[in-house]
Amino acid sequence: MAEDFGFFSSSESGAPEAAEEDPAAAFLAQQESEIAGIENDPGFGAPAASQVASAQPGLASGAGSEDMSTTVNGDVFQEANGPADGYAAIAQADRLTQEPESIRKWREEQKKRLQELDAASKVTEQEWREKAKKDLEEWNQRQSEQVEKNKINNRIADKAFYQQPDADTIGYVASEEAFVKESKEETPGTEWEKVAQLCDFNPKSSKQCKDVSRLRSVLMSLKQTPLSR
């Protein structure tokens, strides 16, 4: 029975050791090969192999995975911050930030084209300003001439209107000279006729006006039959 228990104990103690060594080594080798491929550095995988070899006894002796990961991370950290890798990173950054030749030429052409368009737009704007100023001056001149012509025509029309005989019967006031002449005449019995000429006898339909129909009828009767003295 002791031998049986010894067989099981030996098999149980040996199986985990073999299971722990091979997957860890394969995992580390895969990670280092991927890092070497990314950095494009052929010599990058050499220290990784030594790290794997040095890490295997620690795994077999029962050392924790935390020590190995710290060592690996420390080595990678030192390599990443080394002088050679720092210069390579700066050179790679310069290559990435450097503008391609085609884009640089296109940018220069665009800048030149925009400058030409800006200059052409300024010239066109100046031409439009001069044209607008000239058109405005011509319009003002035509407008002033038209106003003078309208004034002359209105004077002629007013003079002809006031000279017609029935100007006062169609609802307009006669000319000032005729009104003054009639006012100076002292014809007996025509006083109410002159008063009636100053009144508007047309009926008003607006509700805001006062009712003056009675006064209108009185004035009309006085015009027709003046008071006898």
Curated annotation (Swiss-Prot):
Family: Belongs to the clathrin light chain family.
GO molecular function, one term: structural molecule activity
Record's subunit section: Clathrin coats are formed from molecules containing 3 heavy chains and 3 light chains. Interacts (via N-terminus) with HIP1. Interacts with HIP1R.
UniProt organism field: Mus musculus
Phosphoserine: residues bearing it: S11, S13, S217
Name this protein carries in UniProt: Clathrin light chain B
Chief localization: membrane
Record field: compositional bias (Low complexity): 1-17, 45-58
Residues modified to Phosphothreonine: T187
GO biological process terms, semicolon-separated: intracellular protein transport; synaptic vesicle endocytosis
Keywords: Acetylation, Calcium, Coated pit, Cytoplasmic vesicle, Disulfide bond, Membrane, Phosphoprotein
Role played: Clathrin is the major protein of the polyhedral coat of coated pits and vesicles.
Subcellular location as annotated: Cytoplasmic vesicle membrane; Membrane, Coated pit
Keyword check for Calcium: yes
Signal peptide: none
Annotated Gene Ontology cellular component terms: ciliary membrane; clathrin coat; clathrin coat of coated pit; clathrin coat of trans-Golgi network vesicle; cytosol; plasma membrane; presynaptic endocytic zone membrane; synaptic vesicle membrane
